Structure formats: structure tokens, C-alpha cells
Amino acid sequence: MPRPRKRQTGTAGPDRKKLSGKRTKTENSESTSVKLENSSLEMTTTFKNGGKNLSNYWLMKSEPESRLEKGIDMKFSIEDLKAQPKQTACWDGVRNYQARNFLRAMKLEDEAFFYHSNCKQPGIVGLMKIVKEAYPDHTQFEKSNPHYDPSSKEDDPKWSMVDVQFVRMMKRFIPLEELKTYHQAHKATGGPLKSMTLFTRQRLSVQPLTQEEFDFILSLEETEPS
């Protein structure tokens, strides 16, 4: 999500907030048809009611290293989140319909892994929680913002964001390569990470997790790196 930083959020409410944030390279601004939007919504519903039981767990990607887009630094690390007032920020700049629909499915107190992406060593660095459910993403209306979408209207906004709050750092960094090793092994054995969205839909910057996936990843904190 782009902008130099995700800034502090306001109090809960339906009105649009003047906040800024960052996105990952995996999110691309796109003028997608209504058909694609509806398809993504159907896929989100399938995740919730069909194949995957979403429970209340997510993985959310952001870039910890500086990268300029239209003169704006896209960097937003977990340390940046910790530095925000109340360690809380909006998660703006998502421009993928399925990822947006996942944001809209989030509920208060849902838990999410903070995942550093598009960097030298990608992986899970910490935990955060949802402290405000989906509301219009202000950056879609800001002409100077890389996430500006001229096709979106204030009375019918296309894009949403949520507010997240830092919970804690992981007891140890869980790198992508370690997760990939487990994913490959679990595909053969039927283990918890056999269908993890991180590997089946890699480009999504907001991803659902089953409780089984979430609990298994948490358990890795207590083990030595594989």
C-alpha cells in the first residue's frame, strides 16, 4: 500500500479518514471489470463457506524496504507500525478485488500475521489485530497518491481498508523458505499448510488462514529453524 507511512487512525466511524499508508508490490492498480469484481466476491465467499473455513485469521503483506513509486516511498515495516500512535494504522492501498473482499470480511479482534514482502528475506515478523472493520480507503480519491483511482466515486467507493494494531513480535522470524518447506511436505502428507494461500495465490497481499494454519505457524515460534 503506498505512501511513505501508514499514519495514525482516528476514532471508529463511517466517515473517510485522512490517513496514509503503504502497499506491497503484489497489489497493482487495475481497472477491472464488474465481472471480475463479482468473480472475486464469489471466490471470497467460497473461501468462507466452502473449501477454507476462514475463522478469524489472516496474513497481510507489506514492504519493509524503501521503494519509490511516483516519488512516494512505499516502505511500511512492522517497526513503522509499532511507531504509530497507539501502535495503530490503516491498511490502505489494496487494489485487488479479492484482497479487498478479504478486507471487507474482517471482523474486530481478528488476528493477522504481519508479513514482510518484496525484500531480501521475506517472512512473518509479528502479530497484529483488526481494530476497525472495513471502511472507504481515502487514497482512492487523492490525485497525488499512487493509489488514486479516477473511476471510484465517493458515493460509491471501490476500495476499502481496515485499521490494524500491533500485538507483538514473533518469538523468532519465520522465513518464507521455511514455510515453503512445510507446504511442500504437507502437500504429500496432508499437513496443516498443504493448501496455504501464500503458495496457491502468491500475489495476494491479504490472505485468509484457517485456524489450523494459524496455530501451526504459531507453533513454529517454539522450534528451531528448519
Swiss-Prot record:
The keyword Nucleus applies. Phosphorylated. Residues 29-38 have a biased composition (Polar residues). It is found in: Nucleus. GO terms for cellular component: nucleus. Induction: Down-regulated upon induction of apoptosis. Expressed in the medulla containing mature thymocytes, but not the cortex having immature thymocytes (at protein level). Abundant expression seen in testis, liver, brain and kidney with lower levels of the expression in thymus, spleen, heart and stomach. Residues 14-28 have a biased composition (Basic and acidic residues). This is Thymocyte nuclear protein 1. The gene is Thyn1.
